[in-house]
Structures are given as structure tokens and as C-alpha cells.
């Protein structure tokens, strides 16, 4: 029996050592389990592309039809609601005192079944800016015990040492344009209940948290809040606090719960309060219906149609190649060492 002598003079029996450390044999540990290794033959590739194309193209058509079935009215008013004399200095006008009532007329070109959703759309407003997004405190919004936790809310954190509730730039810049609608000299009521996410109302905004010291010092960023209502009931704030990812976004203002008929004229009396002029932003009023896919958005339908069309094109191309110039699977003549030097 062979043996080895270690540096310390100890003697080990190599045969016994190897046998004692050998793991128990298993097909799993030795990677000998039976396995299926599918081969992508040309027929399988053609069939896969064909199935994807046949499924995606009709899906794209359905999505586009649903999107085009949405009736939408968009009215940009930020420029038209500035008096001619003030259009060279819009910021001075919007930050000045006095009512900024603006009357608009909207024509319904296609019937809109209720509910008709009322949105405001802002452009060139970067709610995703890091400093802006971080200037808030979610714990303060939920619980009165965290009222003084405003360390992340600068510069809108306190007034004369007293905390601002809700604190931060996001709440401070609350959108405050208002809209009133009428038809045939009769008011069209706008329902502002349940315009926010239920999960936000119940879990992110406390029922016993009330506004304090909000918008009480200059500069005023946006809208004010009712100090007698808890944050969980201030749905305009809840909608606004769900920040947008892109510089152009829409937020729900309310719902008109009656049908609007084709050819009708809707009169809008709005308060043009919100300052988008200092950053060259745009404001638009949007009336829209919905479909089973939501609002109007052609992207999903176009994406399905594009992918499906490409797959059908590839399926046809590979089928033609397969018929015109077939190649037997596993043919050794195509191996590089079996080809002639000139081939």
C-alpha cells in the first residue's frame, strides 16, 4: 500500500483518504439526469413565427380599434387665457392679484357616453426630478405622530419653527386651476369623489392628519387645502402626490356623469391660476371616454401589429428559402473541413 509523508512528518494512506471523501453517487450530482434538448429546425422556426404573427396581428387590430373608439377633446388654454396686454409678461400676470377667470367653448364632435373623465394635462413639467421627488415625507402624510419629521422636505419644511403639513415641494406645487362646465345654460356637475386610488386614500394618507401652515408664506406654489378636512379626503392632493414619470402627463380632475351628445356646445368657466409660464410649460383641458383598454393610446396596438407583421414576414421568408434551397439537417457536407477550398 502506497503512502505519503507530509511536511509535519505525518503519514497518510492515499487510497483510504480518497475513498472516504468520495461523495455518494447520484445522477443529479453527476449531471446525468435524462434531458430534452430541442433542436431548432427550420420547420419549428417557421411554425413559431407563424403562430406569433397569427396571434399578434389580430390583437393589434383589436387594441387599435379600442383606442380609436375613445372620444377625446383636448383644449389648450394657457396662452388664450392671458389678456393681450399681458402676453409679453405672462409671469407677472399669473403671479398678480385678482381673479383670472377665463371662458372657453368646447364643441362635442362625437357622442360621449358617461362617465366622461375630466383631466388636466401639463407639459414640460418634470415631476420626476430627483430633488422634487424626494422633497416630501410619506410618514408625515400617514400619521400625526410624525408631524415634525420634515428633514427631507426642505425648503418647504417649516414656518417659524412650526412644521408644514403636508411638507415638501410636491405638495407645495399642487395644481390649482378649477373648471366649471355648463350646457344649454345648465350646469354640468363634476363628481370629484373617488378620483384617487383607493389604496392611496386608505394607506398613504391618514384620516387624522390635517393640513397645518400650508401655503401661509410667500412664495405660494399652488393650491391651498381645507384645514378642517383630513388628508385622506383631499383627493386633489392625493392625485397630485402620485408623481408622473414623464414631463407630459395627465391627472384626473373629476367625472361628468351624464352623456354628451354630438354637436353640443360645452361652456367652460375656468380659473387660470397655475403658473406654468415661468418654465415654458403648457396647460390643457382634456375630456375623454374610456375603453376596455383605458384611455386613448395607440402604442400597444401598433406594437402588436409591428411584431406580428415582422414574424409573418420572417415565416414567409424562411418558407421560401426552405422550398427553394432546402438543406438537410445534420448534413456533414456543410462542415468547413468537408468543403472544397474554392467553395
Where are these regions (language model features)?
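Helix-loop boundary elements of multi-pass alpha-helical membrane proteins
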Residues: 16-54, 320-338
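Membrane-embedded alpha-helices of multi-pass membrane proteins, especially ion channels
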Residues: 53-68, 312-322
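Membrane-proximal N-terminal segments immediately preceding the first transmembrane helix
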Residues: 16-40, 82-94, 279-290
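Extended, hydrophilic extramembrane loops/domains of integral membrane proteins
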Residues: 118, 253-288
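Juxtamembrane interface at the cytosolic side of transmembrane helices
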Residues: 293-343
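Soluble non-transmembrane domains of integral membrane proteins
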Residues: 99-238
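Extracellular beta-rich ligand/substrate-recognition surface
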Residues: 88-100, 241-248
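Alpha-helical transmembrane signal-anchor/signal-peptide segments
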Residues: 65-87
Amino acid at each position: 500500500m502506497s503512502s505519503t509523508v507530509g511536511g509535519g512528518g505525518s503519514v497518510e494512506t492515499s487510497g483510504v483518504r480518497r475513498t472516504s471523501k468520495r461523495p455518494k453517487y447520484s445522477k443529479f450530482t453527476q449531471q446525468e439526469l435524462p434531458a430534452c434538448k430541442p433542436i431548432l429546425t427550420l420547420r419549428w422556426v417557421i411554425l413559431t413565427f407563424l403562430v406569433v404573427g397569427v396571434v399578434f396581428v389580430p390583437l393589434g387590430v383589436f387594441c387599435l380599434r379600442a383606442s380609436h373608439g375613445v372620444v377625446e377633446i383636448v383644449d389648450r388654454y394657457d396662452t388664450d387665457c392671458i389678456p393681450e396686454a399681458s402676453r409679453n409678461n405672462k409671469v407677472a400676470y399669473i403671479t398678480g392679484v385678482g381673479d383670472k377667470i377665463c371662458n372657453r367653448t368646447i364643441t362635442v364632435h362625437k357622442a360621449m357616453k358617461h362617465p366622461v373623465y375630466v383631466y388636466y394635462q401639463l407639459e414640460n413639467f418634470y415631476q420626476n426630478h430627483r430633488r422634487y421627488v424626494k422633497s416630501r415625507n410619506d410618514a408625515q402624510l400617514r400619521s400625526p405622530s410624525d408631524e415634525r419629521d420634515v428633514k427631507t422636505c426642505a425648503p418647504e419644511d417649516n414656518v417659524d419653527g412650526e412644521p408644514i403639513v403636508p411638507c415638501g415641494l410636491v405638495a407645495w406645487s399642487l395644481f390649482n386651476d378649477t373648471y366649471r362646465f355648463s350646457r344649454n345654460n345648465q350646469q354640468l356637475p363634476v363628481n370629484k369623489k373617488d378620483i384617487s386610488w383607493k389604496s392611496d386614500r386608505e394607506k398613504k394618507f391618514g384620516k387624522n392628519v390635517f393640513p397645518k401652515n400650508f401655503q401661509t408664506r410667500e412664495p405660494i406654489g399652488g393650491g391651498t387645502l381645507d384645514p378642517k378636512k383630513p388628508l385622506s379626503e383631499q383627493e386633489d392632493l392625493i392625485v397630485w402626490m402620485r408623481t408622473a414619470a414623464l414631463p407630459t402627463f395627465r391627472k384626473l380632475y373629476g367625472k361628468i356623469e351624464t352623456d354628451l351628445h354630438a354637436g353640443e356646445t360645452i361652456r367652460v368657466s375656468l380659473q387660470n391660476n397655475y403658473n406654468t409660464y415661468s418654465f415654458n410649460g403648457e396647460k390643457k383641458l382634456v375630456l375623454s371616454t374610456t375603453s376596455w383598454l383605458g384611455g386613448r393610446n395607440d402604442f400597444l396596438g401598433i406594437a402588436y401589429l409591428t411584431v406580428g407583421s415582422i414574424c409573418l414576414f420572417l415565416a414567409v421568408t424562411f418558407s421560401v428559402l426552405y422550398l427553394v434551397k432546402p438543406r438537410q439537417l445534420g448534413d456533414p457536407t456543410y462542415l468547413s473541413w468537408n468543403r472544397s477550398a474554392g467553395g
